[in-house]
Each structure stands twice: as structure tokens, then as C-alpha cells.
């Protein structure tokens, strides 16, 4: 399902899914660094990883989406170094290839504000998943007898109905006709 996210694709998700398999058993990633060690993030690509961070796919590893998003360059570099070392069969004195590489520092920072978080999620998924920009206004909308889309559908099944709706303008496109008139 995550392969359907914008700019992610099946191949990127296949690499991540394969990284979850350890000795034939599916094991979830425990941290972002565990993900970087088990999946060659450079092969996955930065753009798919950005979209996964925006969508909340890594929320179990770190709920601060902005920190993950901003740390991707370091994580991709760390992952590339580990996988380069593994492919050259270099093993440290202390264990497997890449185990001796220090984890990059992820700077502490505030997460995106709720509106920013929803906006970033919308960019990745194409709709609001964890909330809606109008959630903060629901009490006021109910007082004004504004209906939800579900309520409108429910009433429409019973016959013609007039309803007030609220929405969010997601974008504006101003175009010009052949005569130069804007519409």
C-alpha cells in the first residue's frame, strides 16, 4: 500500500520490505538507524524516503516527522557507508560489516505544527490521513448546522436535500482563454 504514495513506487517498497526479513523471519525495524543498516537507503532514493517521512510511515520509529525529514541526508549517507562496507566484505574486529560505523547525530527539533504536518501528509498521500484542517473548527461548524459529507450522502439517499458544507481550498489555477481573458 505504501508503494502507492506519490514518488515512492513498488521498487522502493520492495527494498524496504526485503530489509524487514532477517533469517527468513519478518522483523520490524526498531530505530531509524536499524532501518539504515538493514536497507540500502541510497538504492531506495531520497525522494521516496521523504514521501514516507511526510506520510507518517516512520512514526513508529520516531513520531517527529520533521526531524526524520531533515535527517534523511545523514541517514542515507550512513546507510550507503554501511552497505558499501558490506559489499566490499570488510569486517571489523568487533562484528559484522558496518557495526563499527558511528550513528549520525539527529538534531533535536520541534515537529511540524499541526497544520504543517497535515500539509506535508497531503503532499505525500494526496488526502488528509491523520486529521483535517477543519478539525479545530468542528464545534463552530456544528453550531452553524454545517454538515459532513457523510451526513449529506446519508440524507441524499432519502431524497433531495439542501445542505451547507465547509471545505478547504487546496489550490487555485488561473488560466487565460485564447482571447486573453482570465478564468
Task: Set out the residue ranges of the language-model regions.
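Sliding clamp-binding short linear motifs
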Residues: 1-158, 175
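OB-fold and OB-like beta-barrel modules that bind single-stranded nucleic acids
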Residues: 160-173
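Short aromatic-glycine-enriched beta-strand elements
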Residues: 176-183
